Structure formats: structure tokens, C-alpha cells
A protein has these predicted regions:
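C-terminal motif of bacterial Sec signal peptides marking the signal peptidase cleavage site
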Residues: 19-22
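Ser/Thr-rich, low-complexity intrinsically disordered terminal regions
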Residues: 27-162
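Bacterial N-terminal signal peptides that target proteins for export
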Residues: 1-11
Length: 162
């Protein structure tokens, strides 16, 4: 009987720990985009993108919103990125670069995932706050304007992953 109680306690502790571990995660909008290239190569591609298309850089007037989304302690395998879109609707995407070599020892792939969208207020919109049409519009815009250019710069195959 004691083993049964110990098993219940252990299961409860595991459930509590997994809930606490998920507290600082935001989820993601759509699937992550996997580039079959190294993190260094994708970082260089991002630098080229911002150099050739400076309009995607976060404007100073939008920098005040950064602190309301980037509260979580930095992870050794993610890096925060922001992409600004001036055209209608004006939006700022909070995206993370996920370094798979740190997590899986696979240095030949790196992922980008949209975590949240801001439309000019202190409130960031997470996936749970979007209807299907809005989510699809965000994903299409990111794919058409950002991913397509990064694919060319990295010369790599790009796949979608959940």
C-alpha cells in the first residue's frame, strides 16, 4: 500500500513540475520553420536580411514593447528576434531562433518560431488570442516576406515542424 501512495505522490510531483516548466513558455503561432543549415549560417542570413531590408528592423518607437514580452530568462538554445512590418496592418513579430545543436547536437539545422505579435500596444497577441484567419495571415506574411528571403540567403532546404 505504501508503494501505491508513493507512486501517487511521485505522479503528482511530476505533473506539478511539468506545469511549472511550461509557465514561462509562450507557445507559438503556426509551425516552426526549420532551416537545414547551421545557426551561424542562419545568423549571417538574418544580418544580410536586416542590411538589405532595414525596414524589417524594429523602429525605436516600438522598442518600448520589447520589455513587455521578453521577460523570461534567456535560454542557451534560443535567441530573440523581432521583425517589423509597416504596411497594413502595422505589426511587430516576436520570433525566436532555436539552436538545435545545443538541444539535439544537430548542428545542421536551426529553427525560427513566431511567439507573439504586437499591433502597437503594450498587449502582445499570442496564438491563443488569434482566430484561424488571423493566424494564417501572420504565417503567410512571415513566410512570404522573411522565410523566402532567408531561404535564398542560406541556400538551404526549409521545412515546417510542429
Amino acid at each position: 500500500m505504501i508503494k501505491h501512495k508513493q507512486a501517487k505522490v511521485l505522479i503528482m510531483l511530476c505533473c506539478i513540475c511539468s506545469m511549472l516548466a511550461a509557465c514561462n513558455t509562450l507557445g507559438q503561432i503556426g509551425d516552426s520553420v526549420r532551416f537545414n543549415t547551421s545557426t551561424a549560417n542562419l545568423e549571417n542570413a538574418l544580418d544580410s536580411l536586416y542590411k538589405n531590408y532595414p525596414e524589417y528592423k524594429m523602429p525605436a518607437t516600438w522598442a518600448k514593447y520589447k520589455s513587455s514580452i521578453v521577460k523570461v530568462s534567456p535560454s542557451p538554445y534560443t535567441e530573440d528576434k523581432f521583425f517589423y512590418f509597416k504596411s497594413n496592418p502595422e505589426e511587430l513579430y516576436y520570433v525566436v531562433l532555436i539552436n538545435d545543436s545545443v538541444m539535439t547536437d544537430d548542428s545542421a539545422r536551426t529553427r525560427l518560431a513566431i511567439r507573439a505579435v504586437n499591433r502597437g500596444s503594450d498587449k502582445w497577441i499570442l496564438e491563443s488570442g488569434l482566430d484561424n484567419d488571423a493566424e494564417e495571415t501572420i504565417i503567410k506574411r512571415f513566410d512570404d516576406e522573411i522565410v523566402s528571403k532567408l531561404r535564398v540567403y542560406t541556400k538551404s532546404k526549409v521545412l515546417k515542424e510542429e
